[in-house]
Regions:
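Conserved beta-strand segments of the P-loop GTPase G domain that flank and frequently precede/overlap
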Residues: 40, 66-67, 86-88, 121-123
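A conserved SF2-helicase RecA2
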Residues: 91-100, 104-135
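A short beta-strand element within the Helicase C-terminal
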Residues: 76-89, 118-121
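Conserved helicase ATPase core of P-loop NTP-dependent helicases/translocases
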Residues: 24, 28, 33-68
Length: 135
């Protein structure tokens, strides 16, 4: 992911200031309160990440947006997650497993109650990402 992002001339901060803000704007337009949406990159210390994780697990933060590098290994926020949305296709299969692992794990109240949890992949028809998801 990081290599691909650098090849495109971007970094997590650029994503945060562009794509992530647009996603938040659209969510707010659909009625999601802004304080229930957070960006993983805004939590830069162990203490702030702990607070973030507690807020996601309690439901105070309903939507957490971030990259694989910011939300990968060690992120335990599965308690109330109902869906995982992929807006790109990572180059490494283990990154897909890591992303889906945020939601598909023991301790998820939805999964443990037998409710469906969902994983979505968004792609542009005919794009390279579409090809990657089909491999």
């Amino acid at each position: 992911y990081e290599e691909r992002l650098k090849a495109l001339g971007g970094d997590d901060d650029e994503l945060a200031n562009g794509v992530y803000q647009e996603i938040k704007k659209q969510l707010v337009a659909q009625g999601v309160p802004p304080h229930e949406i957070a960006f993983a990159h805004d939590f830069n210390t162990d203490a702030s990440r702990k607070v973030r994780n507690e807020k996601v697990n309690s439901g105070d933060i309903r939507i957490l947006i971030g990259s694989t590098s910011k939300m990968g290994a060690g992120l335990n926020v599965q308690t109330r997650l109902a869906a995982c949305h992929h807006v790109d296709c990572p180059w490494r299969p283990r990154d897909i497993e890591q992303r889906n692992g945020r939601i598909e794990r023991q301790g998820n109240l939805h999964k443990d109650a037998g409710k469906n949890i969902r994983v979505f992949q968004y792609v542009t028809e005919g794009s390279f990402d579409a090809l990657m998801w089909h491999q």
